[in-house]
Each structure stands twice: as C-alpha cells, then as structure tokens.
C-alpha cells in the first residue's frame, strides 16, 4: 500500500479586501442576538490526500497547486499544513 500524506490548505481573503460573505454572517449573527461579534472573515479549507512520503516535496507541490489554482493570490492568502 503506498504511503500518503494529508495536506490542509486554509485560504482567506487578504487583509483590506472586502469580504461580503463575512459581513453577511456578521449581520446575521447580530440579528440572532450575538452582539459581541466585531468582525467576521470567511474563507475555505481544502483537504488533499497525497501519494507522497517526503513532507518537504509534498508541501512544495501543494504550494504550487495554490499558486496555480487553489488560491487567487491577488486577493487571497493561504496557509499549508502537511500531516
């Protein structure tokens, strides 16, 4: 059985980029009585199962995936975790 590594990519809008989904969630939370929420930023988490054994090369490959497809690096930032 081949070894696999799991990668988790957290993608968020960069600071200063308008987050309309986050604002909608913040407004809805206020409507529901959660008045202590000052800001909401919404993002996404992408999980990948990789047929790889070397953590460093797996992370480099996932970062390349982010740069080419998984994140819009003009307006989004990302963080990669390898487990």
Residue ranges and their predicted role:
Residues 1-83:
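Long, contiguous binding/interaction regions
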């Amino acid at each position: 059985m081949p070894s696999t590594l799991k990668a988790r990519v957290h993608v968020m809008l960069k600071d200063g980029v308008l987050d309309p989904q986050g604002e909608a969630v913040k407004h809805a939370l206020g409507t529901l009585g959660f008045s202590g929420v000052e800001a909401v930023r919404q993002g996404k988490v992408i999980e990948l199962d990789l047929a790889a054994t070397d953590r460093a090369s797996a992370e480099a490959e996932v970062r390349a995936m982010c740069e080419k497809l998984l994140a819009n690096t003009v307006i989004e930032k990302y963080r990669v975790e390898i487990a």
